[in-house]
Amino acid sequence: MSDAAGPSTPSSRKRSKWDITDDDSLSPKQEQSLIKKRPKVKNIRIHEPEQLRPPNKPPLLVDKSLLSYSKYVPPRTHHPPLTSSRSVYSYERLNQIEEGSYGVVFRAKDKQTGDIVALKKLKLDEEKYGFPITALREINALIACRHENVVGIREIVVGETLTQVYIVMDFVEHDLKSLLTLMPQPFLQSEIKTLMRQLLSAVAHCHKNWILHRDLKTSNLLMNNRGTIKVADFGLARRYGDPVGLGGMTQLVVTLWYRAPEILLGATTYSTAVDMWSVGCIFGELLLKEPVFPGKNEMEQLSLIFKLLGPPTQLSWPGYAGLPLSKSLNLPIAHAPQFRQRFTYMTVAGIDLLSRLLTYDPGKRITAEEALQHPYFSESPPPKHPDLFSSFPSVAAGEKPRRKPDSPAAPHGAAKYQLLTELDLP
């Protein structure tokens, strides 16, 4: 049996590394014992209009338990073809790259083509109510946002149990957080322009396809050895054009250091501007080689923002006073923004772009499309060609182990937050 033909039984193949990582998973027999049987209910008749019912056709029988959800199911005349998933054993596991809140990422080799890929094993062991919403969002967003600067999704593969599901993605050698830690000096201005232009291009494409990323940070920006940026980790992404329920949108998004002030102050509705604030934080981090707002909690995060931008006013942020947490804050004494003092060597155009990204009022914050046209990218020095970037040893490929960068994790409660139900589906 070929590797691509589907999962093989344990007796028909040797034990592999994929089995080692799943010792804590339930066996198929144990999984079946956990499946609750639906209580039996009597079928009832649905009264169809006589003129719509073909002659000699009996009344439609349906399960009474479904009536609370829908009284009419439109007929389906076409069923799209479904392609069965390949087995994870079609890949040779090479090494583990990282483990996050929502999955474990491995580097692997396709046994048929020899391609090196990244496999993200979804954490399904603790799921009690089906497939996790974060995984559905990530798959949906990766498919909707195919772009040269977004990590590519290849396929979904499965193991031998229902808890073994993997997303196969392009392997990228580095992430910007690790590179900033490794590099003795910050990126050059010409290199920062290239990185920022690629990031803005990817974000503009996502927003054009109605996708909010909601967790942009340097550790989620991958870069290959040819200087090309790939935006990754869409686990917190959602479609922002969807209707918002009465509870609003969840505030448990965006890693703290990159979280927009409107979210920190309890806003229940937000837009693409939250991603643009994160882009501004990334821009500043590339310039300083350290995070701009490394707060330990929400209050300290706001304090660091107020220190750089000055406290918000009715003029700089007209909607500030209406946010849920605004009245509980004691604002510092008003002062002018400190961009020039913090970013000493930036040009006037560079400071202008940074300040327009880190703007209090979400409605005035620059968009990705507008930022791509900013004069900063056309002034000297010009953006460096990606092929001219220096190369570095890849930690993900196991070339040179080093200390893991100190970076906060994404909000752990987001996957289980009560608003992430039908109010926040992709």
Predicted regions and their residues:
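Intrinsically disordered, low-complexity regulatory segments that flank or precede the catalytic domain
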Residues: M1-V88, L425-P426
